[in-house]
């Protein structure tokens, strides 16, 4: 399978987290600078409106207060556009009931990455995988912006 897609290597544990500016469902961010002094969990999902991604987001949102108590900021990412994200998050809040969770409001930022710049910067676009969806990845970034764990 041939592709002309430029694919970047995933940063490694111990590397400084790559910095970027992005539009999110909570406004513009400068990552990781806007969350200085906090732990950060940057996680990607392949697509809005899919069952597994929906259950993951509902679970993260349902437990957000626990992350905040640990001085940790959640930040989601996919290569879907902002309007798709907004519609999906509205659907989650208004229509989805999952394992007793309903009326779940996702208030952490969800990054619009239609250019795939952030996904490429973090190595979320993989050879042999979809050229229009980021693979699932989770980055745990410490308060000094160093990547400590990658899942």
Predicted features along the sequence, with ranges:
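Chalcogenol-based redox active-site neighborhoods
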Residues: 1-151
